[in-house]
């Protein structure tokens, strides 16, 4: 299994210090699971991190989950393993007026899936649950449209040239935009991918919820009415949006 660590690290374009940190965390991970992957071993590894600070634990989760995804991608494992415990940092609620440096979201990244997830939330206000069910047949690259069917509501959204570029370049599945052997990835996978990207660009205090809040505030600032935004988000009622329009 050690050789797979080196192959994984060789596939990354990261600084020497980050490389050393990845290598240390992964060697420690293999030692603690006795070089044998199983759900039970992963649970034991997660418990071994309980004494660490939230930020240190979050870093190790990200590193190990990237490695586990790599093992699955190169067919070392016959199923997708992941650390499933959610790591929460101390609450640092981002105010509605938080100014994002948008350029960071569009720069080249080591986490293209996480980047696309972030952009689809920030630009279109989509939920991770909606992204997980998004089928390729619902994406029209020629007209730059995405159809989102939530069962009770259907919305058709136009997307930017930047998202078109990412969609065109991204390796996608055969059925879903984000796919694991023909099936949607888990919610934890979306959390991990988004978190890894946000950590990379220096916005690890953000979340899917705060990115969606930024979308809502930007729509309001563009002059989108409360009812128009309610429809755009596919909500049955504007109640949850009213607080943003009181700002």
UniProtKB/Swiss-Prot annotation:
One Gene Ontology biological process: DNA transposition
InterPro entries: CB, DNA_brk_join_enz, Integrase-like_cat_sf, Integrase_catalytic, Integrase_recombinase_N, Integrase_SAM-like_N, Tyrosine_recombinase_XerD-like
Superkingdom in the source lineage: Bacteria
One annotated Gene Ontology cellular component of this protein: cytoplasm
GO-annotated molecular function: DNA binding; tyrosine-based site-specific recombinase activity
Keyword Disulfide bond: no
Localization terms from the record: Cytoplasm
Keywords: Cytoplasm, DNA integration, DNA recombination, DNA-binding
Domain Tyr recombinase: 91-247
Domain Core-binding (CB) intervals: 1-72
Active site, UniProt feature: 212, 244
Family as reported in the entry's similarity comment: Belongs to the 'phage' integrase family. XerD-like subfamily.
Known function: Putative tyrosine recombinase. Not involved in the cutting and rejoining of the recombining DNA molecules on dif(SL) site.
HAMAP family linked: Recomb_XerD_like (MF_01817)
Protein name: Tyrosine recombinase XerD-like
Upper classification of the organism: Bacteria, Bacillati, Bacillota, Bacilli, Lactobacillales
